[in-house]
Amino acid sequence: IRRLRTRLGIPPERLQVICTSASFKDADYAVEFGAQLSGKDPTDFRKVQGDLLERPGAAKGTAADAAALDAFDLNDFYEAASDADRLKVIEGFLKYRKVTAPWELQPSLYKALESFGPMSSLVNSTMKEAQPVDELGAKLFEADVPAEVAARAVTNLIALGSVARREPTEPGLLP
């Protein structure tokens, strides 16, 4: 950002910057980071802190949970031509989570995931600090889940969580 600002000839005082992240453990470092990133003076930044709202019911997923998430091909989900086709891809997972038909993609996924222990664990752990994706399987699923199954389950969980919404105008369940 600093180089772009310089190349465009924008003086620091004309640049407004909003940096957001829950992954900084030290708010003062966040100010320094924003200043370095933008080329602005650290005194131009104000830190705003809040409390994390953790999702209830966080728990490690079982082998059955991982298998249900691993049972569909994410490429098929993304390549589906319509929401109805996407629902066919994830039908088994929705049934596993006991979401009753008729289904609508976003709200049905929200119902399936809002109280799903691994989803709550994913949200809670990733909002505190950045997490290496390749370590999430061991954090989100019990030890008896094979690593490759857990990895695919995490990938599918992240994808579904970003689509899951109560209403189309709301953000996804996975922030």
Please describe what each predicted stretch is:
Residues 1-10, 14-16, 20-175:
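Helicase motor interdomain insertion/brace
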